[in-house]
From Swiss-Prot:
Presence of the UniProt keyword Hydrolase in the record: no
CDD domains on file: hemoglobin_linker_C, LDLa
Pfam families membership: Eryth_link_C (PF16915)
Residue ranges annotated for the LDL-receptor class A domain, each copy included: 89-131
Protein name: Giant extracellular hemoglobin linker 1 chain
Subunit details: Disulfide-linked dimer of identical chains. A model is proposed for the subunit structure of the Tylorrhynchus hemoglobin, consisting of 216 polypeptide chains, 192 heme-containing chains, and 24 linker chains.
Disulfide bond sites: C91-C105, C98-C118, C112-C129
Keyword Disulfide bond belongs to the record: yes
InterPro entries, A to Z: Eryth_link_C, Eryth_link_C_sf, LDL_receptor-like_sf, LDLR_class-A_CS, LDrepeatLR_classA_rpt
Species the sequence originates in: Tylorrhynchus heterochetus
Bilayer-crossing regions: none
């Protein structure tokens, strides 16, 4: 027949095409020609480079989106807290608000004790029971108002958290150790002093409380806003509660 004889041999009028690798009728691969091969490799390399750039751009867009999403969520939480604070359903200073529809308040000593006393669990959730100033945290502030509290009259005040211990028998009041560094100026000369102090952390008010080892019985408190672990309002007061100095501190670690 036209396609073959009885022995299976091809009786085609045309030879079978060769050169499946781009060599045409010669049967040679295109890569056998160094000039063609180099050109194609260079073209592939350029395409891969373009793809890598596109992937990098997409990664940057994704990172920016995630960062923006986190910032928006924190901003929303801050606004929510501000609105809550303006409404007339506050708990007194010795209680924590459960922030529920019933406006429930629970005692300060029940916050972060390992048992849920708020029906919504707000007193034991991660946000409430996280310590804003962990070990190694360092905060510094400038004192620009008249200091009627201290003997040293510092112009700069820094505290560094050196240890936090959460007692098993009373976890709602972690013990804190810190170092206080003060810079003072007198007669044009700067002096620095340091104090090792003990204190506690107050979950209800997000507050570090440090007690002076001196005989002046001063108490230093630094209160963190909700959703902000980088700034705190510093207050120096006498053991009787009278405030004699206020200033703002910022995280520097």
């Amino acid at each position: 027949g036209a396609l073959g004889d009885r022995n299976g041999d091809c009786a085609c009028d045309r030879p079978s095409p060769r050169g499946y690798w781009g060599g045409g009728m010669t049967g040679r691969s295109a890569f056998a020609d160094p000039h063609i091969a180099e050109g194609r490799l260079a073209n592939q390399d350029a395409r891969l480079g373009t793809l890598e750039e596109e992937v990098d751009k997409l990664q940057h867009k994704y990172d920016d989106f995630i960062a923006g999403k986190t910032a928006r969520r924190e901003r929303f939480a801050q606004l929510k807290d501000r609105v809550w604070g303006l409404e007339a359903h506050h708990c007194d200073d010795d209680h924590l608000s459960c922030k529920d529809v019933a406006f429930t308040c629970i005692g300060h000593n029940l916050v972060c004790d390992g048992h849920k006393d708020c029906l919504n669990g707000h007193d034991e959730d991660e946000e409430t029971c996280s310590i804003a100033a962990s070990v190694g945290s360092s905060f510094e502030g400038q004192i620009r108002q008249l200091d009627t509290c201290t003997k040293r009259k510092p112009s700069a005040f820094r505290f560094i958290i050196t240890n936090v211990d959460v007692p098993k028998y009373f976890p709602q009041e972690p013990h804190v150790k810190a170092t206080i560094l003060m810079t003072s100026s007198k007669d044009g000369h700067e002096t620095q002093s340091s104090l090792a102090v003990d204190g506690v952390y107050d979950f209800t008010h997000r507050k570090v409380i440090l007690y002076s080892p001196d005989k002046d019985n001063l108490i230093f408190e630094c209160t963190f806003p909700r959703h902000d672990n980088n700034h705190c309002k510093g207050v120096m007061k006498h053991s009787g509660g009278d405030v004699c100095l206020t200033f703002t501190l910022e995280r520097i670690d």
